[in-house]
Amino acid sequence: MIYNYSDAQPTYSNGYLWPVLLETINNRAWSSKRAFDLGCGNGATCNLLHEHGFDVTGVDTSISGVMQAQASFPNVRCEIGSGYDDLARHYGVFDLVVSLEVIEHCFEPRSFAKTFLSLIAPGGIGILSTPYHGYIKNLALALTGKMDSHFTALWDGGHIKFFSLATLDTLLRECGAQNIHFHRVGRIPPLAKAMVAVVSR
């Protein structure tokens, strides 16, 4: 599914994802600051990283998103590209790789995860987020009658993968990740809106 972007403003989910992103990068000593945003959308996260001193490249399948990014953020490099492409061969590897709220849209999450991990330089980190699912949250959705609105069955091209901590951890480890730390964000942990995996190489 390809989003159509009408502006370069931060998304709703950026409001609860960016604090973890900033905490992670600010608590780290960087000898080099090259960053890659896999699924950069309208470039808002690329711009945030640029404002924190990173040399940023991003790719997205959305033409409108990339056009918004190029028009609004000339100091970052945003281009058309897919998580199924051999991006490391084309762009190289990076000290920081970010992918926020993208993998849940992918028919081939293993291929996407392998691309994500391939972009992380030795000694670098990757930060990947996706909506959180777990027993208590799913039960709460069912009991409050919000399953339909949450799973967005009528959203053309919407979310097609629904990860728990266990399934996302399994996916990343199958694809070669070893050192993974999780954060749950947006609400109290059992009802979290999203989870953020921080992968160290």
Locations of regions flagged by a protein language model:
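Conserved catalytic-core motifs of eukaryotic protein kinase domains, centered on the activation segment
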Residues: 109, 139-140
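A structural motif corresponding to the C-terminal end of an alpha-helix
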Residues: 174-177
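Catalytic P-loop NTPase motifs of RecA-like helicase/translocase cores
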Residues: 106
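Conserved N-terminal segment of class I S-adenosyl-L-methionine
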Residues: 1-92, 96, 100, 109-113, ...
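A short glycine-rich, Lys/Arg-flanked "PGG" loop and its adjoining helix->strand segment in the class I
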Residues: 113-122
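Feature marks short, surface-exposed loop/turn motifs that line or immediately flank catalytic pockets
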Residues: 123, 134-136
